[in-house]
Amino acid sequence: FGYHVSNFYAASSRFGTPEELKRLIDEAHGYGMYVIMDIVHSHAVKNELEGLGNFDGTGYQYFHDGARREHPAWDSLCFNYGKNEVMHFLLSNCKFWLDEYDFDGFRFDGVTSMIYLSHGLGEDFNGYDSYYNLNQDGDAICYLTLANKLIHEVKKHAITIAEEMSGMPGLACPFKDGGMGFDYRLAMGIPDFWIKYIKEVRDEDWRAGHILYEMTN
């Protein structure tokens, strides 16, 4: 459903041509709307015939080697953000979509998976000990910080949104305050919570303490 990316510099022809996508964005701008791209830099397709997994004859030009190469839950490949080639490739990708298609920003997919060595799997993020315990991928955090800096330099009013489950402190703080520079955090747990509550819990059984915990978690 679009999250195992094979070509990072091309929109899928299933939905139209590049010119049609550009025209769609221009039309939206004409109505005063911002167009935010859902950008996937958290992983890539494992299929070597169409993706980057064996681009230079090895499995690790863009990705980790060994145990960290494959994502344990997504059946995909994990970028090695510590490599200059990867950093340049992904930063250039951000700039490409801004310059060539005039997108107004990005919703970064799977940020939790990027910033933790465990990908956030099986973690209960309930305090600072959960965020600062050597389980963080410093290279990924560096990449995301540079990406935010680049995006806002290329397009001053661009918007960046992090899909992030853990509530990492500083995620949406400015660079000058030591943050990663995202404008917003998309807290996926809150929508899921409300959907479940509205569908499954009777009004008279709503618990204020439970709701407060979820909203401030």
Model regions: which residues?
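Substrate-binding/active-site clefts of carbohydrate-active enzymes
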Residues: 1-136
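Conserved alpha/beta catalytic core and glycan-binding cleft of carbohydrate-active enzymes
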Residues: 102-104, 119-217
